[in-house]
Swiss-Prot record:
Keywords: Cell cycle, Cell division, GTP-binding, Magnesium, Metal-binding, Nucleotide-binding, Septation. The lineage of its organism: Bacteria, Pseudomonadati, Spirochaetota, Spirochaetia, Leptospirales. NCBIfam families: GTPase_YsxC (TIGR03598). InterPro entries: G_ENGB_dom, GTP-bd, GTP-bd_ribosome_bio_YsxC, P-loop_NTPase. It comes from Leptospira interrogans serogroup Icterohaemorrhagiae serovar Lai (strain 56601). This is Probable GTP-binding protein EngB. Residues 32-205 form the EngB-type G domain. It comes from the Bacteria. Mg(2+) binds at residues 47, 69. The gene is engB.
Length: 217
């Protein structure tokens, strides 16, 4: 990057707007606009993380009742890319039927979203990483989608817990050596700059592509 995208007292991403919600993956129009999606269990802090990355307080709706998000919510960032808040899955208060429906919607999206470039898999650092999440990581690699494992709420871990988490991360990276993992605390801001840079780098890629098209035409 040739310039600092964030000046003092300015948000990292200046132009952010909610665009649309979809109840089914096949309703999403193919626009050729790159997407970064946020997936994870209903209590992992997906929507809070999206708001923190974009430095907006309530862009993505955060509910006190986990599992409320049932739609694919699209946010247009810097006139370049979409950030997609996916429905949460796996919350214990939801029925098995609800869980299957949300997982089905997620997998349909992964299979049909040709513009999806990166998936932020958001996981509470206080919890074990279930097999479903590991399978999602593998699915991303198979489809040439960059997975980023985001371990949230690390401010709630003591040093002993943090040491245990790092050991578990090492085991996961032995399974997926190319996996990028970011430890995040919305409270302290730790890890947010790394995630913003991933988003910004994709915006720069789009910007450079458009400039090349203009030069050719």
């Amino acid at each position: 990057m040739n310039e600092d995208p964030q000046k003092k007292d300015e948000p990292f991403f200046k132009d952010v707007e909610f665009k649309a919600s979809y109840g089914k993956a096949d309703q999403i129009p193919s626009q050729g606009t790159p997407q970064i999606a946020f997936a994870g269990r209903s209590n992992a802090g997906k929507s809070s993380l999206l708001n923190a990355i974009l430095e907006r307080k309530s862009l993505a709706k955060v509910s006190s009742t986990p599992g409320k998000t049932k739609l694919l919510n699209f946010f247009f960032v810097n006139h370049s890319i979409y950030l997609v808040d996916l429905p949460g899955f796996g919350y214990s208060a939801n029925s098995h039927k609800d869980h299957e429906a949300m997982m089905g919607l997620l997998m349909d999206y992964l299979n049909l979203a040709k513009d999806l470039k990166c998936l932020f898999l958001v996981c509470d650092s206080q919890r074990e990483l279930p097999e479903e999440e590991l399978e999602l990581i593998g699915t991303c690699f198979e489809r040439n989608i960059k997975p980023v494992l985001v371990r949230t709420k690390i401010d709630k871990l003591n040093q002993s817990d943090l040491s245990k988490l790092r050991k578990k991360m090492k085991n996961i990276h032995e399974l997926y050596p190319m996996l990028e993992t970011v430890l995040v605390s919305n409270k302290s801001g730790k890890g947010l700059p790394e995630l913003r840079k991933i988003v910004y780098s994709l915006i720069e890629t789009v910007k450079n592509r458009l400039e090349r098209i203009e030069e050719i035409s």
